[in-house]
Amino acid sequence: MDVVFALGGSVLMPKEGASTENIQNYAEAFKKLKEMGHRVSVVVGGGNTARQYISVAREFTNESFCDEIGILATRMNSMLLISALGKDAVKHVPENFKDAELILNMDKILVMGGTHPAHTTDAVSATLAEFIDADLLVIATNVDGVYDKDPRCNEDAVKLDKINTKELLEITGSASMSAGSSGVVDPLASKIIDRAKLKTIVVKGIPEEILASVTENHNGTTITP
């Protein structure tokens, strides 16, 4: 199966900072998926690395330039994961989908970050999945699925086990699009998922759920066309 993962930067690089063990655990999960015969692509977010830089830069510059800073942070995080993957990856972070596809055609795990200002890595992962005709998009984040409202702000939020892409659009329609913003699925990514009719799964960004996402045994939300 051809699977694209959107790996949240905040799960790879939490507030506590880089952890060799944490990064290695993710690398081992992706290696195992490759060994199982899956073609694996990973789009890594900027997470706290990006937000720290952006919060300072925002005092001096505009959102577009802050986006550029965020993109560089995603590529730094990508390089960390690439280093942990060893021979299963290529020591290069592609900046466009054509170069990304070349890496996949080398039978390697593809790891990349952001590409353009105003595009979150969720949107990049959805577009990549459409570009390579992936069978599945998995969004691995710091929330364990899609809720009817933001569970971080609403104690009565209800997790949805299964929704369709139109329902996803309704839920995500009013989310923030500023540099460094971090919703479960951002509005642009939701539109691409709907347009491309992508089967998508949103799971808690831990190695166990990443492995379970290629089966029906995950604990997240399944989004169907």
From Swiss-Prot:
GO terms for cellular component: cytoplasm. Its main location: cytoplasm. InterPro entries: AceGlu_kinase-like_sf, Asp/Glu/Uridylate_kinase, Uridylate_kinase, Uridylate_kinase_arch/spir. It is found in: Cytoplasm. It holds the Pfam family AA_kinase. GO terms for molecular function: ATP binding; UMP kinase activity. It is an enzyme of class 2 (transferase). GO terms for biological process: 'de novo' CTP biosynthetic process; UDP biosynthetic process. ATP binds at G9, S10, G47, R51, T141, N142, Y147, D150. Its EC number is 2.7.4.22. It catalyses: UMP + ATP = UDP + ADP. It comes from the Archaea. Homohexamer. Belongs to the UMP kinase family. This is Uridylate kinase.
